[in-house]
């Protein structure tokens, strides 16, 4: 049953309020500082299956995960390790301001008459309890993106005698994550122009010829470039492929030649394992990437490079085959593929998480269907995916969702693909965050609907969802589920904002795009962007635009 109460900053009850539906009235003669909590108790369970969209997934962090960020631990709390049996968060962290247990819960809007709203949950005597706070409370700590817990952030409202407000409190299920409101395309430029700008930026600012590479990051102010290239993920093959595809379509031989040179560089530099290396750096040459264990190569990094190199053409077939041979040789009897491979032998060094799912599309497209299907049967058992990016260890991320969608669509396993897409879309913003007009995002009236939260560990918006644009469109058209195509249109529209149209546009150079849009109080102040251009952000926008043009999206 839904119940309302007024609470003081310390959580104790405050008297003098009446509640009629969602209307709250303060009836005392003196002002008071208090918040309002709407709380829903759910049936007893031993697995509450928490979901705060974009923020919290089940226990949220497995015990073996090396990256610290909020984790659910029944019956105990350790704030220094960001572990607790009760959590509260501000609404703008959430891709939809909502909280669920077992698919049931409460939904609200980001902003209320009392200030920004909040969500929270706890397990009390075996019963999940979910709530909405007006205004928000962040407890038992405030997560600022670092591994050091910040003090809790508790907001209250100053009530005047006789004041009455109407709050947005709705009971709901996971269908609440499908936004039905009309959508107005906020893109600054049409798809064709966005492709041209992204291609220009990728070639002009990120490409270097000796050796051929796409720099992972370059500064808006032309300071602090990172002279390194992953073979995929944050640089490398997928984005060289996009540049090659664009250059071929528009007849720009300079773009195509640069892309081919990057692909040649990657394909001709295999590790002793027979796979690609993970990363090239100016100081160390070819090396293993960002994981602290320098004997391991991350499977998703290798697999995406293999997939997009295969798509680039038969010229690089030998390198593709070498990588797939390693993946197949190391596949377990139950179908699992390694999450990481040893740099010398190619043998599995980790099975944790689901990063190995990224091999499936490459296996399918190369005709290795038996191995791909066995892997699909294994990964089809999962309802939470984790471990795709190199930088957050075993955290669940939106990138895991993209990898799962790409895998199951490649297999034409439409039921698994729908489940993967629905999970992935829990990271997608269904509303436009309110920004102060005194911030960069506020001045440019940035619309967040269609953007994805990177992960519970990295709470910023990013454009990586464009990597699975073709698969989402195919899924929509095969199943008749037009919501998948609509949200994919929104995803592409969102990131046709903030592609620099000219030098000086939002402080960037023409064609630059950023990795991070700060929609909440994490890493940097809300309303800013990271003033770096990334090869992957321009590359994935270019890829998404080229695919959209081909598909008539």
Q: Where are the model-predicted features located?
A:
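Polysaccharide-binding surfaces and accessory modules of carbohydrate-active proteins
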Residues: 2-125
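Low-complexity, Ser/Thr/Pro/Gly-enriched N-terminal "stalk/linker" regions
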Residues: 9, 126-129, 163, 173-231, ...
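Beta-strand-rich recognition/accessory modules
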Residues: 87-188
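Glycine- and aromatic-rich loop/turn segments at beta-sheet edges
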Residues: 196-228, 268-293, 328-348, 379-397, ...
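Active-site lining segments of carbohydrate-active enzymes
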Residues: 285-294, 307-365, 422-428
